[in-house]
Amino acid sequence: MKVIQAKSAGFCYGVQRAVELAEQTARERGGCVMLGSIIHNAHVVQHLEQLGAHQVAGPEEIRPGDTVLIRAHGEKKQVIGHLKDIGAECVDATCPNVLRVQQIVAQADAEGRVPIIIGDPNHPEVMGVASWSARSVVFEGAETLQRWLDEDPARRELPLTAVAQTTCIRIIWDGAAEILKKQCTNAKIFDTICNATHKRQSEAAELASQVDVMVVVGDRKSANTKHLTEICSRQCPAVYQIERAEELKRDFLTGCSVAGLTAGASTPAGIIKEVYTTMSEEIKTMEPTEESFEEMLEKSFKTLNTGEKVTGIVTAVGPTEVQVDLGCKQAGY
C-alpha cells in the first residue's frame, strides 16, 4: 500500500503573495486589520492574528487611520471607496488574477455591456467582481444561464461579457461558455479560470482515477477545496475532505492499496506534510508483517533438543505411532 501526493497541492501564487504581504504588514506596522479572512484557512488566519493582524467582520468596524488588509478574494468596489473616504490605509492583497477579472467587468461596464459571471454568487470573490458593474448578472452554471436567456429571448441580442470565478470548475465554465457561443449574437467570452486552478483540478482528477481512496485537505470554507472534492468524487468512490491530520480515521484506508492526496490552494505545506505523514504511518500499521526468505529458511533449519517442550500439529495417527509437525525439518513420532 502507498500514498501518492499531487504535485500541485498547496499554496498557489496568489495565496502565497497574500499571506506574505499580511505577515510583512503586521510586523512593520505593529498590527493591522484584516477585513474578513485574508484567505479561506482558519489556521493561517490564526497565525496572522498572533502576529497582530486583527480580523473584523465588516467595514463598519474599521476606524480612520487603520491599516486594512484587502483579502486575496478582493473586495467590493463600494467598500474600497468607503475605506478611502474615512481615511483608512488599504494594503491590497487581492490575487492578481482576481484583479484582472475585476478590470474586465469594469471595462465591460464602461462599454455599456452586461457582465455575465459564472461562479458562486455568495463567494466574496464573485461579490467583489460583480460590484464593478450595476448590470452584472451571476450564474452558478449552464442551467441557470439557460433559464435566464429563455425568460426573455431578446437577451440573446444583448452585448454580453462573460467571465468565470477564478476557481470555477472547468466543466461548469465550459458548459456556460458553449451556450453563450451558440445562442448569443454579441458575447465576449473571457476564460478567467487561473492556470494554477486548472492544473490542480486536472491533476486531482487524474490521480483520483488511479487510486482506491482520495483525501482532499483544506478549509471547509474554501471554494477551490470544495471543487477539488467534487472533481475527485467523479473519479473515485471514496473521497474524504479534511482540514487537519487529526480528522483522518483508520477506516478511511481499510482495504486500500493506493491512496491519493491533494490540497486546496489555501492549505499550508506544513498541514499537507502532516497529513501525508499520518497516512503513511497509518498504512504501515495496517500492513501485515511478512517474514523474509532468510527468516523462513532459518526456521526450517531449527533443531530440537532432548527434553525441550514444543508445540506441534498432529498430522497422522498409526497403530503404533503418532506423527507430529513441529514446524521444522524434524518430525515427532
Cite the ranges covered by each PLM segment.
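Single-stranded RNA-binding regions, centering on S1/OB-family and related RNA-binding modules
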Residues: 284-333
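The feature marks the mature, well-folded catalytic cores of soluble enzymes
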Residues: 1-283
